[in-house]
Design a protein with these regions (language model features):
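Condensing-enzyme catalytic core mediating Claisen C-C bond formation in acyl metabolism
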Residues: 1-20, 135, 214-278, 282-285, ...
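Conserved catalytic cysteine-centered active-site region
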Residues: 20, 51-105, 147-153, 210-236, ...
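N-terminal extracellular/periplasmic Venus flytrap/periplasmic-binding protein-like
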Residues: 7-8, 19-20, 25-28, 36, ...
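Conserved active-site "lid/cap" helical segment
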Residues: 1-52, 56-57, 61-65, 69, ...
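Active-site pocket-lining segment
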Residues: 155-158, 191-194, 201, 264-333
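Active-site-proximal alpha-helical scaffold in enzymes
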Residues: 80-112, 161-190, 243-250, 315, ...
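Flexible glycine-/small-residue-enriched beta->alpha junction loops
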Residues: 99, 105-159
């Protein structure tokens, strides 16, 4: 079960979190997750943190975050790189370890500083005999470009949008909804209980009050002139971290901890490389089937807004009423620090369910390379 869920605000590229390395953000989230429920660092038995952009991060980023949060050196750790699904996979692994009886209490989540991703010069080690060298942006190379077809995620999104018949107009309307819902949630204080401030930053930097359908519809497609994916209906490039404390039922009872949510089922799937828009729904359907549930049994759904097209297609495949999806906005507005987004959608959904009487919640996310993960929880 999950007894704590905390995240940092999500900062824009070069914004309010630019001076923090991913591991520092991870430490802040871990420390806050423990403090929220009165757990001591020495009680934690293991740490699993997702991080995608590990170039230049140093050895064992999850261990860095763990030690930085004040956990004992005896606490082991794993760093997960499953692209956008990294942090939700971390929670799945924690759940599996606890069910196997290996541990009773694990911190799981993710962290990313896309602002601090370095550039690389591949042939610099042995020098260039002749000609020019090219700097490689490790943010786009390791995080945003498909290894298999060499296309940027935006190019894949536009291609699949055409293949699946997802109109540009629908994508822009969903993007507008994402910003509007996120602003409403911020104004209503809905994110306060899940966010730990970092320095002077206490709210997500991405949501725009001044956006409109007219503005979004005038943006030019990115990469593909005939495409439908724009800077407006895609998420930003962001920094942030999130951490959840996952425990056994016996540990929570013994320590007198109130569970925020129970993990009911998990699922993970793989598909053709470009078809990210299908994998959240496929994973979600599998998780529901494992639990013997139907989508109509679910009160809230969080589908990571890797692009508006991903949410639109996955919601259609799941057969879910869009009004139950991303009710407080999503990554198009809030941001998508790739290694931390799974932790964010899971935590946001938990608190939303608690405000509305509980029930089942489904969190699903796609990831580069054509994979997808889903967690079904109950509050």
């Amino acid at each position: 079960m999950i007894v704590s869920a905390v995240r940092t605000p999500f900062g824009k590229l070069g914004g309010g979190l630019v001076d923090y390395e991913a591991t520092e953000l991870g430490s802040i989230a871990i420390r806050a997750a423990l403090e929220r429920v009165g757990l001591e660092p020495q009680e934690i038995e293991y740490v699993i943190m997702g991080q995608v952009l590990q170039g230049g991060a140093g050895q064992a980023p999850a261990r860095q975050a763990s030690i930085g949060a004040g956990l004992p050196i005896e606490v082991g750790s794993d760093t997960v790189n499953k692209v956008c699904a990294s942090s939700i996979r971390a929670v799945e692994m924690a759940d599996q370890m606890i069910r196997a009886g290996d541990h009773e209490v694990i911190v799981a989540g993710g962290m990313e500083s896309m602002s601090n991703a370095p550039y690389a010069l591949k042939k610099a080690r042995f020098g260039y005999r002749l000609g020019d060298g090219t700097l490689i942006d490790l943010m786009t190379h390791d995080g945003l470009t498909s290894t298999f077809d060499k296309r940027h995620m935006v190019e894949q999104a536009s291609f699949v949008s055409r293949e699946l018949g997802i109109p540009r107009e629908d994508q822009d309307r969903w993007a507008l909804r994402s910003h509007q819902r996120a602003i409403e949630a911020i104004d209503d204080g809905k994110f306060q209980e899940e966010i730990v401030p970092v320095g002077d930053l206490s709210v997500d930097e991405g949501p725009r009050r001044d956006t409109s359908y007219e503005k979004l519809s005038k943006l030019q497609p990115v990469f593909d002139p005939e495409g439908t994916t724009t800077a407006g209906n895609a998420p930003g490039v962001n920094d942030g971290a999130g951490a959840l404390v996952v425990t056994s039922e016996e540990f929570a009872r013994r320590r007198g901890l109130e569970p925020l949510a129970t993990i009911v089922a998990q699922a993970y799937v793989a598909d053709e490389f470009a078809y990210l828009a299908r994998t959240p729904a496929k994973a979600g359907k599998e998780a529901l089937a494992k639990a013997g549930k139907k989508i109509d049994d679910v009160e809230r759904v969080e589908l990571n807004e890797a692009f508006s097209s991903v949410v639109l297609n996955s919601a259609k495949m799941l057969g879910v009423d869009p009004e139950r999806v991303n009710v407080n906005g999503g990554a198009v507005a809030l941001g998508h620090p790739i290694g931390a987004s799974g932790a964010r959608i899971l935590g946001t959904m938990i608190y939303e369910l608690r405000r509305n009487g509980g029930g089942l919640g489904l969190a699903a996310i796609c990831s580069g390379g054509g994979q997808g993960d889903a967690l079904l929880i109950e509050v």
